[in-house]
Amino acid sequence: MALSKKQKKKRRRIIILSVVGVVVLAFGYLIYSYGIDYYRKYYACGGVEIDYYRFPVTGIDVASHQGKIDWKEVYDSKVYFAFIKATEGENFVDKRFKENWKEAKQNNIIVGAYHFFRFNKDGKEQAYNFINNVSLSADDLPPVLDVELYGGNKYTQETKNKVISEIFNCLRTLERHYERRPIVYTNIETYQNFIKGNFDDYDLWICKLCSEPKTLDWTFW
């Protein structure tokens, strides 16, 4: 059956739109796949098999973005300690900190709290934010200062020195208040740029999610 010019034009338009749609979907899938691969490479492991013979004591760190946590289930999963996000910067308090702290203790999980360090904020004021919101008993784990580069920030040597000074001020303020030396949590990049050689007196917690660390001598993983 012969098609009119109008029908041919309409069919050509449908074909073009269909091709464009396929290309857009394919491009979107590539972006999605790349995003998933990037996430898996840097942030997720798809689950880590724990050798309980080598590592009989296991723990987790949590924050509000984990949502509501069933702490009984956590304990039943052989997780015996937890570091819980308490504060960030000079005035932010994690909205689930008190809830997580209370319920973890109720389920016989040993707890510790951590502060997320903001590079552009005063170190002492950040320590006071943590101090004003976290009371530690003798049975609790030491305070943790989470120091990680974020947002693709670049630093000159001058600004690096300023950040290092503020990290030191934060750690010293925490140590004087709690009379316990804090733990420094960081990742490889931040360790190389800010921590290495500057905070050797502090226990170091390196973020290495999916495999045992190879670059540093470590106590446990």
Could you tell me what each predicted segment is?
Residues 136-143, 147-153, 158-221:
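Surface-exposed substrate-engagement region within the catalytic domains
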Residues 2, 46-67, 72, 199-221:
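Functionally critical loop-and-helix segments that line ligand-binding/catalytic clefts
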Residues 80-87, 105-120, 142-144:
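Short, well-structured secondary-structure segments
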Residues 60-70, 86-97, 117-125, 153, ...:
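Acidic-and-aromatic substrate-binding clefts and catalytic sites of carbohydrate-active enzymes
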Residues 16-34:
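Hydrophobic membrane-insertion alpha-helices, especially the h-region
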Residues 29-88:
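Boundary/entry segment of secreted carbohydrate-active catalytic domains
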Residues 1-14:
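N-terminal Lys/Arg-rich, disordered targeting/topogenic segments
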Residues 71-78, 96-108, 130-139:
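Acidic (Asp/Glu)-rich catalytic clusters
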